[in-house]
């Protein structure tokens, strides 16, 4: 969305796009001017899980002349809304943090990194991180927030320790919500801006003992596999004899 001057003599608007940080804007579409104060464009040819994108909107007058927009940080055009940058959230499992935080050595972790949203006139008030576990619905409340007013230089990353979720199937999904501040003449964007949904799976861990002693001494009485992050879907456990016959089988 982009707010425009509905009194300007404009024929249409050029939509320009560049991939993350390469500053190579190319035209991807046009938006006809119909006299409203807001224009909309949907970019369907993107890979939001691989890249974040930058956009610029250029007005084109009735003579076909594209009107150059001002630099993004030009103080004379402080209320310009013709530039935008999306959020890319990336995740990675079990990074080696031994040199940074040895307490994480024995933990299962998901590391999340994302870039700044740009650019709202009211700037970003805060970022909110939401999580889904085991393909369940996302949390209604964020599991973490980043306050960009009181701590604007806080790094945009998060280490999610997921060791306690080992009984699940190991599937985790995340997304970021950006909230606009109130210092804007047009009012903050009520719906915010969202990143891609980034999903990741922890590596299944299975340990199967080779003996057990059901002799009543309360040690190793039960033979069963010990699992972490193993899905119950299509699970089966079968014990075979040396000759290949099935001794025991279960889906529990």
Which functions belong to the PLM regions below?
Residues 1-8, 49, 63-123, 183-216:
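Pro/Thr/Ser/Gly-rich low-complexity, intrinsically disordered linker/stalk tracts
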Residues 54, 130, 159, 172-177, ...:
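Exposed, low-structure sequence patches enriched in small/polar residues
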């Amino acid at each position: 969305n982009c707010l425009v001057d509905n009194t300007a003599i404009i024929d249409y608007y050029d939509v320009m796009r560049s991939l993350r940080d390469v500053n190579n804007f190319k035209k991807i579409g046009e938006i006809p001017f119909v006299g409203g104060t807001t224009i909309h464009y949907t970019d369907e040819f993107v890979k939001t899980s691989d890249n974040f994108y930058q956009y610029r909107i250029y007005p084109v007058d009735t003579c076909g002349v594209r009107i150059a927009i001002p630099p993004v940080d030009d103080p004379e055009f402080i209320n310009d809304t013709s530039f935008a940058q999306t959020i890319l959230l990336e995740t990675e499992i079990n990074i080696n943090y031994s040199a940074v935080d040895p307490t994480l050595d024995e933990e299962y972790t998901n590391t999340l990194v994302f870039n700044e949203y740009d650019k709202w006139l009211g700037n970003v008030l805060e970022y909110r991180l939401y999580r889904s576990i085991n393909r369940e619905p996302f949390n209604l409340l964020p599991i973490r927030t980043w306050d960009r007013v009181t701590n604007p230089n806080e790094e945009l990353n998060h280490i999610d320790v997921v060791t306690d979720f080992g009984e699940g199937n190991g599937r985790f999904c995340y997304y970021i919500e950006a909230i606009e501040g109130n210092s804007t003449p047009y009012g903050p964007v009520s719906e915010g801006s969202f990143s891609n949904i980034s999903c990741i799976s922890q590596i299944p861990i299975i340990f199967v003992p080779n003996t057990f002693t059901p002799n009543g001494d309360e040690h190793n009485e039960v033979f069963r596999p010990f699992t972490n992050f193993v899905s119950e879907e299509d699970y089966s456990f079968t014990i075979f004899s040396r000759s290949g016959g099935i001794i025991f089988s279960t889906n529990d």
